[in-house]
């Protein structure tokens, strides 16, 4: 009798251990299902937002929306290439005569003597806006005297 009673206690303990383990597993599964439901909702919201951007009156299934988005992105990439191509091209071996037809001097639009632009043409651009220290500038002289005294 004692043996069966001890065995019964062990079975109850085992069941309790199993039931505790099962309940913790169930809790984790419910947490996972809740978070996957949240993820599914977020993905659904983002797909519907993407559908409104890509094809507001077209198909609403996920595959069609993603396919339309992919085609639209490819179209935008091509548009960027086309619009930026003129800025990326270099003049291939243009002769002096070909360049002179675009010259401002030939059109009478050059307002500054060319001799004064040599320094600007040879600079890297960063030093154009740097302050220049001259003997007349206050930064150059040790004791600055105001002309408004």
Swiss-Prot record:
Cross-referenced InterPro entries: bHLH95_bHLH, bHLH_dom, HLH_DNA-bd_sf, IND-like
Domain bHLH: 27-76
Family: Belongs to the bHLH protein family.
Main location: nucleus
Any GO MF annotation of the entry: protein dimerization activity
Primary gene name: BHLH153
Alphabetically ordered keywords of this record: DNA-binding, Nucleus, Transcription, Transcription regulation
Localization, UniProt: Nucleus
GO cellular component: nucleus
Name recorded for this polypeptide: Transcription factor bHLH153
Superkingdom of source: Eukaryota
Coiled coil: none
């Amino acid at each position: 009798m004692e043996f069966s009673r001890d065995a019964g206690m062990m079975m109850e303990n085992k069941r309790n251990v199993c039931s505790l383990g099962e309940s913790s597993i169930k809790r984790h599964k419910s947490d996972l299902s809740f978070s996957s439901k949240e993820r599914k909702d977020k993905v659904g919201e983002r797909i519907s937002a993407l559908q409104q951007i890509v094809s507001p009156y077209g198909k609403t299934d996920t595959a069609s929306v993603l396919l339309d988005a992919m085609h639209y992105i490819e179209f935008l990439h091509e548009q960027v290439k086309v619009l930026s191509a003129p800025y990326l091209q270099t003049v291939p071996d243009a002769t002096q005569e070909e360049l002179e037809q675009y010259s401002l001097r030939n059109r009478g639009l050059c307002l500054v003597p060319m001799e004064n632009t040599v320094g600007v043409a040879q600079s890297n651009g960063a030093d154009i806006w740097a302050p220049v220290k001259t003997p007349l500038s206050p930064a150059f002289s040790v004791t600055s005297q105001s002309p408004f005294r």
